[in-house]
């Protein structure tokens, strides 16, 4: 994607921020990656089931918080559940700004929970700014971005990890959002 950071650099706690410096292509699957992917297909149903389980646990735990979560499963659709996207609001149900959102991310990192933002709108990246794009022309994209946080959601999370993430979210929300 022409990103300024590779995936490994973005795994450092609280270091979600990156820039897209040009509208380039991302293509990094090798034959080895494809072979690994084929092997993963054998456990794909288990992966989806575990993700769905974690999503349900998270969503049940956050009903009393000033957050809104992306719906993964309805009668009309179901998602792969690879991201748990949460939008942050204050006690008056007003969407928080990026400063508050980033403070939330930092406090979560201090508690040992790596969160992320999916995704920074393209007009905010250098490569697209150079092409004349301006985020002011995309107010809906900015509104979705400004208060969005993505929680850990992967099949290597055990139940204790999930409960710890919930505890950290509740603690951080009580300090910052309420």
Label every model-predicted segment.
Residues 1-178:
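PLP-dependent aminotransferase class I/II
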């Amino acid at each position: 994607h022409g990103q300024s950071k590779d995936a490994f650099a973005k795994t450092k706690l609280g270091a979600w921020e990156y820039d897209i410096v040009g509208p380039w292509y991302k293509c990094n699957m090798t034959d080895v990656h494809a072979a690994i992917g084929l092997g993963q297909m054998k456990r794909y149903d288990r992966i989806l089931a575990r993700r769905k389980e974690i999503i349900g646990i998270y969503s049940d735990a956050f009903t009393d918080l000033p957050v809104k979560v992306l719906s993964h499963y309805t009668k009309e659709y179901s998602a792969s559940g690879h991201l748990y996207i949460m939008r942050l609001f204050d006690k008056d149900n007003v969407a928080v700004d990026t400063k508050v959102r980033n403070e939330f991310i930092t406090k979560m990192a201090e508690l040992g929970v790596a969160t992320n933002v999916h995704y920074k709108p393209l007009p905010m990246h250098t490569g697209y700014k150079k092409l004349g794009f301006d985020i002011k022309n995309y107010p809906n994209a900015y509104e979705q971005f400004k208060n969005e946080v993505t929680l850990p959601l992967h099949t290597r999370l055990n139940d204790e990890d999930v409960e710890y993430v919930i505890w950290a979210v509740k603690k951080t929300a009580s300090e910052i959002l309420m």
